[in-house]
């Protein structure tokens, strides 16, 4: 009971922060903002009904209408709907849930399919993932996906879902199945009806206390039988015989991306018994289940439907200075859900791009997901009545600034630390931007390599660094001393690709300093412009000072 209550409280807190945050407006400001949006929506209505034209996309109209309602309700404190977060737990899965890699488009899918055979397409059913464990012919355990390795014990709940077979026989008598618990629908047309918040509804039903009859509105779509029959046709037949009929009905053999596209489009427009958000293409040949790990499934991919764009309020405009000195602009957003992702930030780009967009805090922007699930701005759909735009920092930075710390160099200096600690450079595991900020704030680094001098005691006493991780971090810092010379040169920001640097065969600092512009220019992917940049870099006073400091620390390749 206490566990469920804690989960419920966290849901309510999360939900209220996402959906029920009201603008911090004075009564006069609220009246002005509401009145302006009201007038705009009325104008759109008049254009549509009186003149038969639409100046705004349906989705934008619907969401701005909902935003107007939200603003109006903010002043009478009406509650919002609950959105359920993902569930985690402590029950170990017999077989890990791998997850599925998403294909950006049909071309990407075609490339993936080219080297594979015996492929099958299934709908990507929108619900919550579950493991079903059968032992001696009976349902022994049901576990929520959680983090892929561990999840919640859902056995009691799943045993009350009449659509889930409680007993099985034959090859399934001692088996582990993976699938999706979904909300049963009658003739759901995805193209017309959308997602209807199905995942949150299923999660809500699975979390609700008591033996509710509403669980009978759920069913399961089995999409994996680890260590099951080798032939997909045999798997489907056995599953159907046991009562998992939907798997056989909605699994089709495909040979290429064109066939997948046809099925995907068919299911997008067809009447289905569940909500979907795309399709999954999987190979019948799978590795043994003991090799399954989260995020490492190479035998299946997903091709999702185009995500729905969302209108989001801009809460703040922030500026960041990258390691190369370029200033980028980021919009902090009131959280919105896009394709089951909570989006709170979107990259605008350069200062010039931000000025072209003319975005200020309080504006409403249309956000969607680009490839790889990265949020992007599609449009500015509404600008607030009172608009104050922050002043960007002076453009005083470049690729050769901020190797040494100073007040004006704070952001670029931190960006350099994040870069040198990344996997492709010095590989300092266990520390990111927040950790670097904590270390620099406490120990006031002189330059980007000052962390090499930190003692275990200093790390242990650093606010923001967990004491349990301080020893591991100190170990990582010491291991970095043994990294190859080229890694240290990359950490110093040499303007070369790793391939070009490796091809140079430079193995010492003295050798690098004596290399000519002509030498650098002959490297792969390095033209005259890049070669000149390398010369400017190695002749920079800060770089020379860092090289001498690393030599004093006896870093490989830098010693005299």
Curated annotation (Swiss-Prot):
One Pfam family recorded for the sequence: DNA_ligase_OB
Leader sequence residues: none
One function term, GO molecular function aspect: DNA ligase (NAD+) activity
Domain of life where this protein originates: Bacteria
E.C. code: 6.5.1.2
GO terms of biological process kind: DNA repair; DNA replication
Keyword DNA repair: yes
Catalytic activity: NAD(+) + (deoxyribonucleotide)n-3'-hydroxyl + 5'-phospho-(deoxyribonucleotide)m = (deoxyribonucleotide)n+m + AMP + beta-nicotinamide D-nucleotide
Keywords: DNA damage, DNA repair, DNA replication, Ligase, NAD
First-tier enzyme category under EC: ligase
Function: Catalyzes the formation of phosphodiester linkages between 5'-phosphoryl and 3'-hydroxyl groups in double-stranded DNA using NAD as a coenzyme and as the energy source for the reaction.
Protein name: DNA ligase B
The species this protein was found in: Shigella flexneri serotype 5b (strain 8401)
Gene name per UniProt: ligB
